[in-house]
């Protein structure tokens, strides 16, 4: 988030070229620096989860390091009994939003490949509340695959430099067939294992349950699309 004026100049040039060839295209930054990205050619920027920042305060607020699995989870604002306030988030979010909302969208994400899944510290009901909040705040919400069904974070050994992030990169869980429907290969041939523990959420199970997290997410997104403001 430092001043990177030359990087910004490059992206403004790319934006100019893109507008000529693909005027309908949108550019999305993974910067978490809306004051730079949205004023230099990007339409959107992710509000990334950085340990200790405002977004982390809302959804995770854990302890840990790159080479260790997260611990002391359960301190986030959306954890029912955490006692954590919302001020740290508001103090970070509001000034940046007010400074950039006319330039583009600073977007909430449920997770990404570099972040522990929100289900690591939030119950299903807490996830419903968290999603209801970030899906109705300004910006365009991004749902990381599997978060719509509450896929669990798996504390796996690091794989090719994944470190603690490895546990958020496991295969999508579609149904209750082999490998949860992700692949017909033998389980030991998968790049990362599927969640084999009892109660592993699947799309098939949640589609059939009107009270599932998946159907809550669908309802929230439908609500968002029918309420422009």
Model-derived features: where do they sit?
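Aromatic- and acidic-residue-enriched carbohydrate-binding clefts of CAZyme catalytic domains
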Residues: 1-5
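Amphipathic alpha-helical segments in well-structured domains
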Residues: 7-11, 127
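Loop/helix patches that line or flank the sugar-binding groove of alpha-linked glycan CAZymes
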Residues: 15, 19-21, 26, 33, ...
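Short, conserved catalytic or adaptor-binding loops enriched in Gly and charged residues
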Residues: 96-101
């Amino acid at each position: 988030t430092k001043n990177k004026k030359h990087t910004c100049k490059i992206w403004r040039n790319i934006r100019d070229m893109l507008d000529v060839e693909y005027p309908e295209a949108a550019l999305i930054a993974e910067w978490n620096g809306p004051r730079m990205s949205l004023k230099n050619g990007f339409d959107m920027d992710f509000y990334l989860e950085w340990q200790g920042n405002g977004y982390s305060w809302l959804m995770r607020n854990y302890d840990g390091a790159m080479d260790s699995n997260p611990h002391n989870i359960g301190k986030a604002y959306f954890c029912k009994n955490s006692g954590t306030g919302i001020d740290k988030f508001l103090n970070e979010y509001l000034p940046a939003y007010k400074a950039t909302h006319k330039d583009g969208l600073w977007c909430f994400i449920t997770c990404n490949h570099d972040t522990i899944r929100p289900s690591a510290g939030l119950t299903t009901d807490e996830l419903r509340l968290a999603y209801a909040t970030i899906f109705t705040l300004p910006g365009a919400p991004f749902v990381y695959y599997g978060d719509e069904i509450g896929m669990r974070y798996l504390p796996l050994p690091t794989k090719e430099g994944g470190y603690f992030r490895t546990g958020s990169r496991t295969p999508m869980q579609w149904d209750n067939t082999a490998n949860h429907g992700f692949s017909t290969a033998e389980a030991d041939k998968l790049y990362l294992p599927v969640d084999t523990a009892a109660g592993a959420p699947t799309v098939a199970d949640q589609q059939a349950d009107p009270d599932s997290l998946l159907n809550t997410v669908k309802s929230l997104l439908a609500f968002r699309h029918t309420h422009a403001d």
